[in-house]
Curated annotation (Swiss-Prot):
Gene Ontology cellular component terms for the protein in this record: host cell membrane; membrane
Designated gene of the protein: SIFV0051
Stretches that traverse the bilayer: 209-229
Organism name: Sulfolobus islandicus filamentous virus (isolate Iceland/Hveragerdi)
Top-rank lineage group of the source organism: Viruses
Location of the protein in the cell: Host membrane
Protein name per Swiss-Prot or TrEMBL: Uncharacterized protein 51
Length: 232
C-alpha cells in the first residue's frame, strides 16, 4: 500500500507588518480571534487563544524563540476538521479594537476530511544595527503582541533632558509601516550646551541621542523606523 504525500503552497501577508506597527504605536489592540475561510465550501471557523478559551475544535497560540540577533515569533492555528474538497484557506485575525488583518493563505490541500489542520506562521524579527538605537527594547516593542499578557500599547513619546533649551517642534507619527519621531530645540545659552533626547515606543526606550550644540545653536533629532517584509 502506498500513500501520496500532500503538497501545498503558502504565503504570509504583508498585513502582518501593518498590524505590528499599529499595535506597537498604540493604534490597535491585541489579537483577539482568528478565522479560517475554507474554499470551495465557503465554510469558516473562528478560533480563540487557547489560554482564554475552553474550545477543543479550533484555537491559536503564540511561541517565542530566541534567534541570532532577533526574536522568533510563531503563530500557531489549529482546527480538528477540514471541510471536504478544501483547496484554499484564507487565515485572518481580528484585534480587540475590531480591525481585521489577513495573516496567511494556503493552497492545494488534500481533499480529505480525515485530516486535522495546523498552520504555523513563523516570523523572525530582527533590527538593522544603527547608532543610538537600542535593539533589545525595539524588538520587545514590536513582539509583545505575541503574549498571553498582551495589553494595548501606550502612544509613542519623546522626552529630553538638558537645561537652557527651548523646544520648537516635537512630534511622533505613523504612516502605514513607517514611524517617525522629530524634535527640534534651540540652545538659549551663550555657551555650548548638551541635550539628551529619548524616543519611547510601547513603553520601551528604543533610541537615545546626546547632541552638543554651540551657543544659541539648534539640536535636530529624527528617528525613522520602517518595517520590511522578506520571505524565504
Amino acid at each position: 500500500m502506498s500513500y501520496t504525500t500532500p503538497t501545498y503552497t503558502a504565503s504570509v501577508s504583508n498585513d502582518i507588518l501593518r498590524y505590528m506597527m499599529a499595535y506597537a504605536t498604540g493604534n490597535d489592540g491585541c489579537i483577539q480571534s482568528m478565522s479560517a475561510l475554507f474554499q470551495s465550501s465557503g465554510e469558516s471557523i473562528i478560533a480563540y487563544n487557547v489560554s482564554a478559551s475552553s474550545t477543543t475544535q479550533a484555537g491559536f497560540f503564540f511561541q517565542l524563540q530566541n534567534v541570532p540577533q532577533g526574536i522568533g515569533v510563531q503563530i500557531v492555528f489549529f482546527s480538528t476538521t477540514i471541510p471536504q474538497n478544501t483547496f484554499f484557506i484564507d487565515l485572518r485575525f481580528t484585534t480587540t479594537q475590531g480591525n481585521t488583518y489577513q495573516l496567511a493563505q494556503v493552497n492545494t490541500l488534500p481533499p480529505n476530511t480525515n485530516y486535522a489542520l495546523v498552520i504555523i506562521v513563523s516570523l523572525t524579527i530582527t533590527v538593522q544595527p544603527a547608532s543610538n538605537v537600542n535593539i533589545s527594547p525595539l524588538l520587545q516593542a514590536f513582539t509583545s503582541f505575541a503574549s498571553n499578557q498582551c495589553a494595548t500599547a501606550q502612544p509613542p513619546s519623546l522626552s529630553y533632558t538638558g537645561n537652557g533649551f527651548t523646544v520648537f517642534y516635537e512630534n511622533t507619527y505613523t504612516s502605514g509601516i513607517t514611524f517617525n519621531a522629530i524634535l527640534i530645540a534651540q540652545n538659549t545659552l551663550t555657551s555650548s550646551n548638551t541635550i539628551q533626547i529619548t524616543a519611547t515606543i510601547n513603553g520601551n526606550v528604543v533610541a537615545t541621542a546626546t547632541i552638543s550644540t554651540p551657543a544659541l545653536g539648534y539640536a535636530y533629532f529624527l528617528f525613522t523606523l520602517t518595517l520590511v517584509f522578506t520571505s524565504e
